[in-house]
Amino acid sequence: MARITPLDRYRNVGIMAHIDAGKTTTTERILLYTGRTHKIGEVHDGGATMDWMEQEQKRGITITSAATTCFWKGMDKQFEDHRINIIDTPGHVDFTIEVERSLKVLDGACAVFCAVGGVEPQSETVWRQANKYNVPRIGFVNKMDRAGADFLRICEQIKTRLGGNPVPMQIAIGAEENFEGVIDLISMRAIFWNEADQGATYETRDIPAELQELAEKKREFMIESAAEANDELMEKYLEEGELSHDEIKEGIRSQTIKSEIIPMFCGSAFKNKGVQVVLDAMIMYMPSPLDVDAIAGILNDKDEAVASRNVGDDEPFAALAFKIATDPFVGNLTFFRVYSGVLKAGDFVYNSSQGKKERIGRMVQMHANEREEIKEVRAGDIAAAIGLKDVTTGDTLCDLKQKIVLEKMEFPEPVIALAVEPKTKEDQEKMGIALGKLAAEDPSFRVSTDEESGQTIIAGMGELHLDIIVDRMVREFDVECNVGAPQVSYREAITTMVEHQYKFAKQSGGRGQYGHVYLRIEPQEPGAGYEFVDEIKGGVIPKEYVPAVNKGIQEQIKNGVLAGFPIVDIKVTVYDGSYHDVDSNEIAFKIAASKCLSEGVRMANPQLLEPMMAVEVSTPENYMGDVIGDINRRRGIVSAMEDTPTGKQIKAEVPLIEMFGYANDLRSMTQGRASYSMEFKKYTAAPKNVADEVIEKLNK
């Protein structure tokens, strides 16, 4: 089967934003205007197509990244049919893992901002993630019909707070309840949408006289930005002071793909104004898969030699699995992005991350939660495979003969944990299955068993994250469970260097056990992680036993000496030891290393580390004193305060343990008028009184 849409007419685009910027509503309008839905779904009545999980419709927020494919020919049908694969990403900070996974496989993103709130905490988090993957962006300032809306103020915030380079491609005609339309700065025409047909049609008029001067000024800035794309455009602009419409578009596209600028648009998705222009912008300014660098990877059977795959159907097949989901009707869905080659239903692929062969049975294209069965996928496609057994998020699927491992995704460590207990014996078995499936879907969610109490512990990125997990167990897997109070995931670290030795010897007739190690245990910089160094000389410990030493150390650092929390940022060097020709084996050296580390860490002045959260509170000014006083009581440190259209924004760092129940306290303190967000920032040493209390409680 030949390719239907040429690769240069593909756009893989993410819609990303802060919670409540109107991201899902924007996506809904895109689906309406591209003909994927015939009825508008509204978030506030729980009918949005892209928010397909029950919890999403109940809470009015997006949790999982729903993927959908649509086609667009332009507002004036001026383009060939373009295929746009859209991923709608969650805006809540507890679900940044979903954003991270989406950005990894996208070629471009549309950042949606609220015209009133502007750059909010989560905008900064998502922006950093997009910078990490070098994703080109366009911006859409939504909710221009709301009180306090100001398009150019938000553009300025993107510059000052996010370090972006926004280039307005439009200016708004009116704002708040008087928002009527936009002025297109390329054609210098005013666009007004028809409210009678939900904005499906529009008309252009002359620019209102009072906006002519501002439009000319902003147009000049836009042309300057386009001219910077290359020497030819700059030369023409300097000579003639003008560029043609096509040259402006060429320059803006080039600068956007290089992530030099962010073309900015505005509108009101809810009032059906401005969304079609954003679709046109995706086609004109966002990269196709051909505009993006070849995907890098390693040849796993050639000692990490670097390899790459160019985009194209005639290249060997390579794809990245970026999400696992459980569908109530078909079971496991593995979402993947195809970077090169062609894959047909029934083909075998090699999972190079796991070293396993998989058969691709059925494949589907997703439209939110509706499935359309397809027979093949090609370079540039985003699709889902049904029923793959051993694939996890971040795995590479590739050609059986031409193996490659694409870049791995990095996932954050959980910072909060809860104990969950099934209510009945029947629930016990179901809970195990449910948690296994949920953990497979979400790498930032972990399940473990407390060795002493036997309790099942679930850990995640925040209270809402774990709330939703528990909620899904009840709704999707019919598991009733009791939930314990949230527990903070502390860490342990050493503060001084220690050298220590341990001899493990059991020799009482017959074959015994013998392992003897000398370890140098040193603290590392925060965030450096674990490092193992082998300095054995002269074979005092045979080479084959050194991996067992490393394994013993790694197992021991999972359970620290103060309160059983993982030990972080530690460097361990094995530099001496001894062995016995008959009695030494891997197990003996593993035990010796484990015991040596445990004793050594106790001598290295260990300390407890607690997670610190970056907290941002938006509050009316008259409550500011109360809010700051409360942050101080919670051992928080205020780092900045900024004016906002509705009051003050306070930035602080607060220990996670002090933030439990904060939502209710803030609500009652400000009569429900303040809002906050928080995300994990770093681990720092807990004060002695706090550490003593935690250690005493856990060692009872």
Swiss-Prot record:
Protein name from the UniProt record: Elongation factor G
InterPro entries: EFG_II, EFG_III, EFG_III/V, EFG_IV, EFG_V, EFG_V-like, EFTu-like_2, G_TR_CS
Keyword GTP-binding: yes
Principal cellular location given in the protein's record: cytoplasm
Places the protein is found: Cytoplasm
GO cellular component annotations of the record: cytoplasm
Family: Belongs to the TRAFAC class translation factor GTPase superfamily. Classic translation factor GTPase family. EF-G/EF-2 subfamily.
Keywords, alphabetical: Cytoplasm, Elongation factor, GTP-binding, Nucleotide-binding, Protein biosynthesis
Tagged with keyword Mitochondrion: no
Xref: SUPFAM superfamilies: EF-G C-terminal domain-like, P-loop containing nucleoside triphosphate hydrolases, Ribosomal protein S5 domain 2-like, Translation proteins
Gene (UniProt): fusA
Binding residue positions for GTP: 17-24, 88-92, 142-145
One BP annotation, GO: ribosome disassembly
Source organism: Ruthia magnifica subsp. Calyptogena magnifica
One of the Pfam families matching this protein, by short name: GTP_EFTU_D2
